[in-house]
Amino acid sequence: MKLCRFKNAESEVRVGLAVDESTIADLSAAGVESITSLLEDTNSTQRISDLAERDLPQLALSEVKLLTPVEGQEVWAAGVTYLRSKKARMEESDFSANAYDLVYEAARPEIFFKSLPNKVVGPGEAVGIREDSKWNVPEPELTLVINSAKQLVGYTIGNDMSSRDIEGENLLYLPQAKVYDRSCAVGPWIVVGANEAEV
C-alpha cells in the first residue's frame, strides 16, 4: 500500500492512497487528517487496509500535485552506509580520514540531523546546491519512516544533497555540507505493510 500527500484542484492538502498506477483514493474524505496521525496508530497497517476497502472518492494522479510526505517531522540520515562510501571519504580528506576508522564498529550509529520539514522539497521540485561548493552531489537513499513510538511504519525514497568538497575539507564542516535550503528531497510515496524483501 502506498500513501501520499497531495493538493487537489482547490489547492487543499489531502492524504491519498494509491489505487493503481494512475489513481489515488482520497483518505481525507474518510476523516484522515494527516499521514502522521495515520502512522501513529498502533494498528496502522490494518487501518489503511480497512480504508482501502471503503468506497472513497478517487482522483487521477494527473489532476493532483503530489507533495512530500514529510509533514512536521525532522529528517535524520545515516552516514557512510556502504563500504565504497567509506573508502571514498577516506581518500577525499587527509584531515578527516581517521574519523572513518570506526565506521560500522562504533557503539553508536552513524546518524546525523539532515533537515527540518521547511527545507525538504517534494517530487518534481528542484533541490538546492551551495554556491560556495564546487562539488555538489545527490545521494539517493532508501528512507525509513519511523513513528514517535520508534516503530518502523513505512519506507519512502530520499535524496540527500551533499557538498563533498566542503565535507572533505574538514569533517567539522559536515553540517554546512549537508544542511542547507532545499538540501533534502523526500517522497512522494510512503510504502506501508511491506517487508524488506518487497522494498
Task: Go through each PLM region and give its residues.
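Active-site microenvironments in enzyme catalytic cores
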Residues: C4, Q46-V199
